[in-house]
């Protein structure tokens, strides 16, 4: 039907007859001549129809935006003064000799033009029009290239692409499952997988020592700004390996991805940072190292001060007091400071103390803060020295339980970095390693795994794990790019007794363990090899590589923030006949006034 994509028509095609198919992007009438910009996924091509061919010219006059056409013509150089170097095909044009309207279009709700600002709901309702925009075509094409890079690299490393079930058993993995009722087993349900975690471990026990899959996963999570109920991850598992093998594999993969897609050369070895250091310096387990701001502990300097907010946190074993210096921050207004104070309350902080350093040489007289009256001059000077302030700086303080300080001041660090344009350009990748095996749930005070219950501790002793669970480190690792967690993984437990110990510590008794994970515990008894793996978020990685602001921009048909699809109106009610066949009766909806 066509001989060329639009962008393939160039000066090598001069004087040749070509045929292209696509959409009418633009139509212009100039001096009795009709100019068309024809668009396909590769780009734009200018076609000229002259009035001498009355029959074809009459068809061209009928064309409107988004008509679908088939165009045949002769390629020629554009006249001097008509060259457009902003277009890939801007040095040539096609003199149309044939024209066929393949389909018509009414005036669309918006034109697929990158220069328009389009309401997001409208974009998703008419996603098939939105995806015609050049920027969207480029993003999804880059995503395809990303997947191709991944497959080529792993295939060369002797990995096998093996599919795992989509209809599986509900297992606790940190979020709610999407349940699928079984018609042939009334009252029973499948679960859509939150990840292929257990199946890929079973593949290692089956002798497939190198597995990968680019796979859809499903999580019925609470609504958050940039989460999708269904998402895509690169899932990897290997047997007879250690942590170093996984890290080197992923470093090699990312090196190829960045080179082939962005022409950026990454170092052979990425920096590594222990989890404890990341939380101490940045208040985050996914620090953006492009941001120069850091948290500085000052608890030892304020233990005996008269400011109870500082003193109580400093003398609490689970408390923390930190300072965060903002260079040249004295220009912040009272309203700005109040807004930042309100911001940290979102993360559980009760407020935000600060000191403005208007004139460092003037001593206490050169400082401005509501808390100065509670602090001795010695304590203040010690803080200023440790934080290494200069005239014009402002210091923010966080004092509370350590988890509140980390979350609130880590978020403030990120916000200040963006608000004050402190984020350096470029790419900062790092591994966060040496994670705690468990954390205490602040509500229930029960142990819960930091990653998942199949992660191996660094010390492979059930007795040691029971004696000091909160001090035990895991063989776990996350890859972070520019402040985004792109992936995480671990070495897995391959000894049945150690796995039972972990289940017991997190409150899964023997009966529940066998009901939910009996198949895994059985498999572990039959010669399970040491194994481990990782999963990378394809959506988020594609978002970063395309410089997008949302993962929805790199997903062809995303859900909205309310987990709905304006295009198809999903989710939607099921018919009574279908519900009856499935043995489901809906409970009445209870509304509260």
Curated annotation (Swiss-Prot):
GO BP annotation list: aspartyl-tRNA aminoacylation
Gene Ontology CC, one term: cytoplasm
Enzyme class: ligase
Main location (coarse class): cytoplasm
SUPFAM superfamilies cross-referenced by the UniProt entry: Class II aaRS and biotin synthetases, GAD domain-like, Nucleic acid-binding proteins
UniProt keyword annotation of Protein biosynthesis present: yes
Xref: Gene3D superfamilies: Bira Bifunctional Protein, Domain 2, GAD-like domain, Nucleic acid-binding proteins
Family: Belongs to the class-II aminoacyl-tRNA synthetase family. Type 1 subfamily.
Binding-site list for L-aspartate: 173, 219, 451, 492
UniProt catalytic activity: tRNA(Asx) + L-aspartate + ATP = L-aspartyl-tRNA(Asx) + AMP + diphosphate
Recorded superkingdom: Bacteria
Source organism: Legionella pneumophila (strain Lens)
Subcellular location per the Swiss-Prot or TrEMBL entry: Cytoplasm
Region feature Aspartate, mapped onto this chain: 197-200
Self-association state and partner proteins as the record states: Homodimer.
Name recorded for this polypeptide: Aspartate--tRNA(Asp/Asn) ligase
GO molecular function, one term: aspartate-tRNA(Asn) ligase activity
EC number annotated for this UniProt entry: 6.1.1.23
């Amino acid at each position: 039907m066509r001989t060329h994509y639009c962008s393939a028509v160039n000066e090598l095609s001069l004087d040749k007859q070509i045929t292209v198919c696509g959409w009418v992007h633009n139509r212009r009438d100039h001096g009795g001549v009709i100019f068309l910009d024809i668009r396909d996924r590769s780009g734009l091509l200018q076609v000229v129809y002259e009035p001498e061919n009355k029959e074809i010219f009459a068809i061209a006059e009928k064309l409107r935006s988004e008509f679908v056409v088939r165009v045949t013509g002769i390629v020629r150089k554009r006249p001097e003064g008509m060259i457009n170097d902003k277009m890939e095909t801007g040095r040539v044009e096609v003199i149309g000799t044939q024209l066929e309207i393949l389909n018509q279009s009414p005036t669309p709700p918006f034109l697929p033009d990158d220069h328009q600002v389009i309401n997001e709901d409208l974009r998703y309702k008419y996603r098939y029009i939105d995806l015609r925009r050049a920027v969207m075509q480029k993003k999804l094409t880059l995503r395809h290239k990303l997947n191709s890079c991944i497959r080529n690299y792993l295939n060369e490393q002797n990995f096998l692409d093996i599919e795992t079930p989509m209809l599986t058993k509900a297992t606790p993995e940190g979020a709610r499952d999407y349940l699928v009722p079984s018609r042939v087993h009334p009252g029973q349900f499948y679960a859509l997988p939150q990840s292929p975690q257990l199946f890929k471990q079973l593949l290692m026990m089956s002798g497939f020592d190198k597995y990968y899959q680019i796979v859809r996963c499903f999580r019925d999570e609470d609504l958050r700004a940039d989460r999708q109920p269904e998402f895509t991850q690169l899932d990897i598992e290997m047997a007879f390996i250690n942590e170093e093998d996984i890290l080197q594999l992923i470093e090699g993969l990312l090196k190829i991805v960045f080179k082939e897609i962005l022409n950026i050369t990454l170092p052979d070895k990425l920096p590594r940072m222990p989890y404890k250091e990341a939380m101490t310096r940045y208040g985050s387990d996914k620090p953006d190292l492009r941001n120069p701001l850091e948290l500085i502990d000052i608890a030892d300097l304020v233990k005996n001060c008269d400011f109870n907010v500082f003193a109580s946190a400093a003398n609490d074993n689970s408390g923390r007091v930190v300072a965060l210096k903002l260079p040249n921050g004295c220009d912040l207004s009272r309203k700005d400071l109040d807004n930042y104070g309100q911001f940290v309350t979102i993360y559980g902080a009760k407020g935000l103390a600060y000191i403005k350093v208007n004139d460092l040489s003037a001593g206490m007289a050169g400082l401005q803060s509501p808390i100065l009256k509670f602090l001795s001059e010695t304590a203040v000077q010690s803080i200023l020295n440790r934080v290494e302030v200069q005239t014009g700086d402002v210091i923010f303080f966080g004092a509370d339980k350590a988890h509140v300080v980390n979350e609130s001041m880590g978020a403030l660090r990120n916000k200040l970095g963006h608000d004050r344009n402190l984020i350096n350009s470029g790419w900062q990748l790092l591994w966060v390693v040496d994670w705690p095996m468990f954390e205490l749930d602040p509500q229930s005070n029960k142990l819960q795994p930091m990653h998942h219950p199949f992660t191996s501790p660094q010390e492979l002793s059930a007795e040691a794990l029971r004696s000091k669970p909160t001090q035990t480190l895991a063989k776990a690792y996350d890859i972070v790019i520019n402040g985004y967690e792109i992936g995480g993984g671990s070495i897995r437990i391959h000894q049945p007794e150690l796995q039972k110990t972990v289940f017991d510590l997190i409150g899964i008794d023997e009966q529940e363990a066998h009901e939910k994970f009996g198949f895994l515990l059985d498999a572990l008894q039959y010669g399970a090899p040491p194994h481990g793996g990782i999963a990378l978020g394809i959506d988020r990685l594609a978002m970063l590589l395309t410089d997008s602001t949302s993962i929805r921009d790199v997903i062809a048909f995303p859900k909205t923030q309310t987990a709905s699809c304006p295009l198809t109106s999903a989710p939607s009610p099921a018919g009574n006949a279908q519900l009856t066949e499935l043995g489901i009766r809906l409970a009445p909806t209870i509304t509260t006034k």
